[in-house]
Every structure is written in structure tokens, then in C-alpha cells.
Regions:
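S-adenosyl-L-methionine
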Residues: 1-57
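Conserved class I S-adenosyl-L-methionine
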Residues: 59-68
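Glycine-rich SAM-binding Motif I of class I
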Residues: 70-74
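Conserved SAM-binding motif I beta-strand of class I
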Residues: 83-88
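Conserved short alpha-helix immediately C-terminal to the canonical SAM/SAH-binding motif I
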Residues: 92-93
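Conserved SAM-binding loop
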Residues: 97-98
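Conserved SAM-binding strand-loop segment of SAM-dependent methyltransferases
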Residues: 106-115
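Short conserved loop adjoining the S-adenosyl-L-methionine
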Residues: 119-123
Length: 124
């Protein structure tokens, strides 16, 4: 682990995957086309900075469009205490997100929706 400005940061993707008890690593472009990008998880260092920015708090609900295997939703719920809804159109990635969402790190604050993000209606 490293520190910057007094904030603790993990040093590797593998460390975060172990802490969160999830499997989200690796690129998957098997279902990409002109309308859909490949699955490529957001780096944990980017998520650490976002979580520590103060923009997302416990009282917030994060909507993760194109949630893939659920890394952003799970990480942000773990780090900030927010609720998170991941929306994914690829059924294979959605199924993996559901498995990852069972992580004790989420404390039932994460849910996933299978569907087109453009058609998703935001909750009140």
C-alpha cells in the first residue's frame, strides 16, 4: 500500500480484488461492435481518487452505466458507503456482476440491472 496526502492507496489490482473478494480484472472485447465498447475495467487508482474526492457520499446513489463485472459499483459502495446500481446490457458480464455483487464488502448496497442503459429510468 502507498499513501498520498495522508490517504491510503492499494498498490495493485490484485490487492483490491482480494480485499473486495471480486473478479473484475481483464479486458473482454468478444462482444464489442460499432455500438458497444469492450469490457475494460476502470483502474483502481482512478476509483481511489474518485472515492476520496468527496463527490460521492453515503447518502448518494451511484448509477453505473455499462457496469460490466461491477467493479465501479462495488468499489464505490465499499469506499464511500453509497448505494450503487449497475446497468449492463451484456448478459455474460451481468451474470459475473451478480456473483461479484455477493461480496461481503458491498453490505447489500449494490444491485445490478440487465438492460439497455439508454432505456433505464432513474429511481426517485
Amino acid at each position: 500500500m502507498g499513501t498520498h496526502d495522508g490517504i491510503r492507496y492499494m498498490t495493485s489490482e490484485q490487492e483490491w480484488e482480494q480485499v473486495l473478494q471480486i473478479k473484475t480484472a481483464g479486458r473482454d472485447d468478444s462482444r464489442s461492435d460499432t455500438e458497444h465498447h469492450p469490457y475494460e475495467p476502470t483502474d483502481y487508482c482512478v476509483l481511489e481518487r474518485l472515492a476520496n474526492s468527496g463527490h460521492i457520499r453515503k447518502k448518494n446513489t451511484l448509477i453505473d452505466y455499462g457496469s460490466g463485472k461491477g467493479r465501479v459499483s462495488i468499489f464505490m459502495a465499499y469506499q464511500t458507503g453509497c448505494h450503487s446500481i449497475g446497468i449492463e446490457y451484456d448478459e455474460r458480464l451481468y451474470e459475473k456482476a451478480l456473483i461479484n455483487g455477493e461480496s461481503p464488502a458491498t453490505r447489500n448496497r449494490v444491485s445490478f440491472v440487465l438492460g439497455d442503459a439508454a432505456l433505464y429510468e432513474l429511481p426517485d
